[in-house]
Amino acid sequence: MYFYGMKNTHPFLLAAFLCLFLAPSCSKKSGSSAQTCQIITVTDQLGTGTTTYNITYNNSGQISTEQYATGGQNYNRVFTYLGSTEMISTSNGTNTVIDSVTLNSDGLIVTDYETIGTTLNVTTNTYSGTELQKQVQVQNGGTPSTTTYTWTNGDLTGSSSSTGTSTYTYNTKASEAGDYWSIVQLVNYGSSFVKTAHQLAGYQIGTTVENVNYTYDNTGKITAVTGTSGTSVETISYQYTCN
């Protein structure tokens, strides 16, 4: 699978082209009572490689910390919030990446100033309502890289940049915690810049085609998402805590 525009410290191999995130909580019906559920463990398996993310939340239900190990190194990601500003610090004990993120009134990411050593990456998102229309990325004040997006019936269905075009398809189920866009953005940003009406079912980037399938429990929560491209299969599974 390919996670677009992911952070350099993000080990998901679904990485490549755009950057994204959704709300971490979901609702579960149990008799006449409703429970609020949050993803606390994400296990990403590709071939013989496995990465596990352990996630905690603050009292407001926002992601607070995230720990994972990849490439023989342990990473700690800390999220802090002040008004419309979100700060994200990702460290392996030697190097630290800092993101300063500004959110709009819909809670969507407008700007992300990412500092990696002496490198500054600035991402600016433009919306029509809650639909991402354009994303501009600039590194160290250099030449801007622009991606534009198209939407159909509340779903992101296409993107175009100087490197090519991509198309996206969806199933008929409403988007929820644990679906493709949701988990990409939760793990990387704790906030969103793409919110779709339905769950991503597949996409094509150039000649690469990926099919995305979901596993649900008996309450309807997503417990795993599987990406298949040719002979490559990646499975991301979840554990929840419910109150």
Per-region residue spans from a language model:
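Short hotspots in intrinsically disordered terminal tails
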Residues: 2-3, 240
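Buried hydrophobic residues that stabilize the cores of well-folded domains
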Residues: 28-243
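C-terminal motif of bacterial Sec signal peptides marking the signal peptidase cleavage site
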Residues: 22-25
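Sec-dependent N-terminal signal peptides
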Residues: 12-20
